[in-house]
């Protein structure tokens, strides 16, 4: 087999392939064997009919078509490997010549990873916010912890922000009931914004047993994107009473004996979260600097695939009705044109980021160990509330294990760049990136949010 590569653009090539028929003998043998199992000829046992008789029955053209279709994928892969083509996406294959008994010729056009000129990472510099641990931040965490240990008490008054209520919901569109928007006995914290839009504003001032109507746009189901008249009926109203800030509460809610010890622990935890937040800001700013300074040609087909995926996700909850999407966008004060532009901009940034970080990883010989891959899988399984075995099975079935591997590798590549960059905070102090990224990871997803700080302190009580 012979192959040549034409560079059509920085991100696309055409591979020209010539395959002599003698190299197709295994493919012909495979085709005849399959035909012999499918076709019964008098005087021959199943699978034993001679090739010439089989060919006479189905025609030479049918055999050739089967052989060529079976041969193309493997010959294409062989050509890509032999020419060290860094292909991405699916190829467009065209058969250009079939000389029976002599030669098969075909071309394959495919997007490829572009050549990227990388900068001197030590010349990169970014400025980030300093780490600040305020008394207010510690008090916020203490309040969050007190709320976790608060008690709910029924009250005989109108609903106020922060109350906990039980409600019944129903909705109509153009006077017609919407069954999927009907629910009874729902529990809701007023002000949380967890249920339908407009609910929190509607229930404030309503007493138990009373109803209130308001309008809201439905976001799912047969009536997605349509304005509905929603009726909410309040069943019960409860307020949360918080425990006092004292040593007794510290002993109840944590492993500590005094309130001062609990506050000191919360301060340390806030500090760790602030470090993680700063690491995330450093990572984002270094990446932004790279994206602004490094030229990365973008493969059009790959970008288009990302845009198509964004549209698919957007209409998935709307029964794949693009008209419903357009109406929903209009009601949200935007348009389909803006949506398409945002989707394209996002796709271009995503593809550019992946190509750039992959190029950095290749240039730095970044590897991913089994322990690192396992750690990421365990983290993501926990994040989605799934057992690790179930999560692994799901990503394997979806063919996403390679994507997880690539994400870990890209994170390590970016961390390597961050460690070489110059980072200062807005006060002029130098930031030690080795302390933040010394484990080779730029992944700050695993960090607890500030809302989880108090939760961690409370969990210490379970270990006393």
Curated annotation (Swiss-Prot):
Region of interest (Disordered), residue spans: 428-464
GO BP term, pick one: cell division
Keyword check for Methyltransferase: no
The protein's Enzyme Commission number: 5.2.1.8
One GO cellular component, as annotated: cytoplasm
Molecular function GO labels: peptidyl-prolyl cis-trans isomerase activity; protein folding chaperone; ribosome binding
Annotated catalysed reactions: [protein]-peptidylproline (omega=180) = [protein]-peptidylproline (omega=0)
Keyword entries, A-Z: Cell cycle, Cell division, Chaperone, Cytoplasm, Isomerase, Rotamase
One family name in Pfam for this protein: Trigger_N
Presence of the UniProt keyword Cell division in the record: yes
Gene3D superfamilies, A to Z: 3.10.50.40, Trigger factor ribosome-binding domain, Trigger factor, C-terminal domain
Top-level taxon: Bacteria
Location in the cell: Cytoplasm
InterPro entries reported for this sequence: PPIase_dom_sf, PPIase_FKBP_dom, Trig_fac, Trigger_fac_C, Trigger_fac_C_sf, Trigger_fac_ribosome-bd_bac, Trigger_fac_ribosome-bd_sf, Trigger_fact/SurA_dom_sf
Residue ranges of domain PPIase FKBP-type in the record: 162-243
Stated family: Belongs to the FKBP-type PPIase family. Tig subfamily.
Stated role: Involved in protein export. Acts as a chaperone by maintaining the newly synthesized protein in an open conformation. Functions as a peptidyl-prolyl cis-trans isomerase.
HAMAP family with a match to the protein in the record: Trigger_factor_Tig (MF_00303)
Domain notes: Consists of 3 domains; the N-terminus binds the ribosome, the middle domain has PPIase activity, while the C-terminus has intrinsic chaperone activity on its own.
Entries under NCBIfam families matching the protein: tig
Protein known as: Trigger factor
Source species of the chain: Rhodococcus opacus (strain B4)
Organismal lineage: Bacteria, Bacillati, Actinomycetota, Actinomycetes, Mycobacteriales
